[in-house]
Amino acid sequence: MANSFATKYNEEIVPALTKKFNYTSSMQVPKIDKIVLNMGVGDAVANAKNLDEAVEELTLISGQKPMITKAKKSIANFRLREGMSIGAKVTLRGDRMYDFLSKLINVSLPRVRDFRGVSTRSFDGRGNYTLGVKEQLIFPEIDFDKVNRTRGLDIVIVTTAQTDEEARELLTQFGMPFAK
């Protein structure tokens, strides 16, 4: 069965964007390339168990095993050595990407306290959107009782759009709740 967001993209979003931006081919229409979830665990330097918990939570959120990120340089002030494990990241593509986007827009973002929409200023100038989440508890898979501390994560939505305007329109069509 095809994903509802993938179907929505092909049947509704492509024609709407083609009309708005006057594309000559459906291949010119921007699409979401991948979604990257990154969780930096700075306190993993002192306690490696914190990294394991972060990896477990990221696995639950994404449905995919994360890659452990390592320090590129040694920083003495942070008691950090090159090659130490300091975070985890997951790259979602295809159906898992659309599933996650659907869950993010319809379930997780509305659960954020005092939510008034996501910032429109988080585009990078090349059509990619970055979103920071302060606590992982907004995701339905995370059990509140099993969490020993709140961790934030970064969500980067990489699109094939050439401009921020195109990317914003693409995400708006998917239902991303931008702040007015």
From Swiss-Prot:
A Pfam family: Ribosomal_L5_C
Family to which the UniProt record says this protein belongs: Belongs to the universal ribosomal protein uL5 family.
NCBIfam families: PRK00010.1
Top-level taxonomic group: Bacteria
Function field: This is one of the proteins that bind and probably mediate the attachment of the 5S RNA into the large ribosomal subunit, where it forms part of the central protuberance. In the 70S ribosome it contacts protein S13 of the 30S subunit (bridge B1b), connecting the 2 subunits; this bridge is implicated in subunit movement. Contacts the P site tRNA; the 5S rRNA and some of its associated proteins might help stabilize positioning of ribosome-bound tRNAs.
Keyword Ribonucleoprotein: yes
Oligomer and partners: Part of the 50S ribosomal subunit; part of the 5S rRNA/L5/L18/L25 subcomplex. Contacts the 5S rRNA and the P site tRNA. Forms a bridge to the 30S subunit in the 70S ribosome.
GO cellular component: ribonucleoprotein complex; ribosome
GO biological-process terms attached to the record: translation
Keywords: Ribonucleoprotein, Ribosomal protein, RNA-binding, rRNA-binding, tRNA-binding
InterPro entries recorded: Ribosomal_uL5 (IPR002132), Ribosomal_uL5_bac-type (IPR020930), Ribosomal_uL5_C (IPR031309), Ribosomal_uL5_CS (IPR020929), Ribosomal_uL5_dom_sf (IPR022803), Ribosomal_uL5_N (IPR031310)
UniProt GO MF annotations: rRNA binding; structural constituent of ribosome; tRNA binding
SUPFAM superfamilies (UniProt xref): RL5-like
Protein name, UniProt field: Large ribosomal subunit protein uL5
